[in-house]
Design a protein with these regions (language model features):
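Transmembrane core module of solute transporters
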Residues: 1-106, 206-218
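Hydrophobic transmembrane architecture of multi-pass small-molecule transporters
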Residues: 110-203, 209, 214-218
Length: 218
């Protein structure tokens, strides 16, 4: 999201940080609440809620255009942050629920490593898709920008290099926005595809008098 805001919306770095910061606040609040609920309710239900809330935020982002108000960016970010908070905490609790205490240090290292690897792969895939789709959509849009297009010739002087440069900039912006929307759509589908996998997650109920499971987070 920050690269999109800076490259397409022209947001300064400081403004980008301000409009995306509420997402982190939503995550923090959700993690505090989720930490209190772990051990008191089925973690699968918490994970389900987290994934569905995240999917709602991504669905809203699929409607992004080049004309966005800051509230259009802030609220989906807050919703997504809340969803992620309800995913991270229960997921960590499930990971360490059946792990022997003497193995938790090693388990924390492996868990953090795998999560970082997964995040890196996900970011790389999304960035590659954005770059590729931008080029594909750009080529598709340019096909219709030729002297045979009467509406284009009527409104623009295609013999002017300045006009051609301006048109190319406009097409690139539109292509980039479509590519980002397609990326949000891909993440939306991936989030929904994860939901059925919750059926194989084992939920360990806390016995009477047993302390709530410790949650290891970075």
């Amino acid at each position: 999201l920050p690269p999109m805001l800076e490259a397409l919306m022209g947001y300064p770095v400081a403004t980008t940080g301000l409009v995306t910061a509420p997402s982190g606040v939503g995550t923090m609040v959700a993690m505090l609440i989720a930490g209190r609920l772990v051990g008191r309710m089925d973690v699968r239900m918490m994970l389900l809620a987290g994934f569905l809330v995240s999917a709602v935020a991504l669905y809203q982002m699929m409607g992004y255009t080049l004309v966005l108000s800051q509230s259009d960016i802030v609220w989906p970010g807050v919703i997504q942050g809340v969803g992620l908070g309800f995913v991270f905490v229960p997921l960590s609790a499930v990971t360490f629920a059946t792990l022997a205490p003497e193995l938790r240090a090693d388990g924390t290292a492996i868990f953090s490593l795998m999560r970082n690897i997964g995040s890196s792969i996900g970011i790389s895939v999304i960035q590659a898709q954005v770059t590729r789709n931008t080029q594909v959509v750009h080529a598709s849009l340019v096909e219709h920008m030729n002297p045979a297009n009467a509406a284009l010739v009527q409104n623009y002087d295609l013999s002017s290099p300045t006009t051609l440069e301006s048109l190319n900039r406009m097409v690139t912006q539109q292509a980039s926005m479509i590519a980002y929307v397609d990326a949000f759509k891909l993440m939306f589908i991936a989030t929904l595809c994860v939901v059925p996998l919750l059926a194989i997650v084992r939920s360990r109920r806390r016995a009477a008098g047993e302390d709530a499971p410790h949650v290891a987070m970075d």
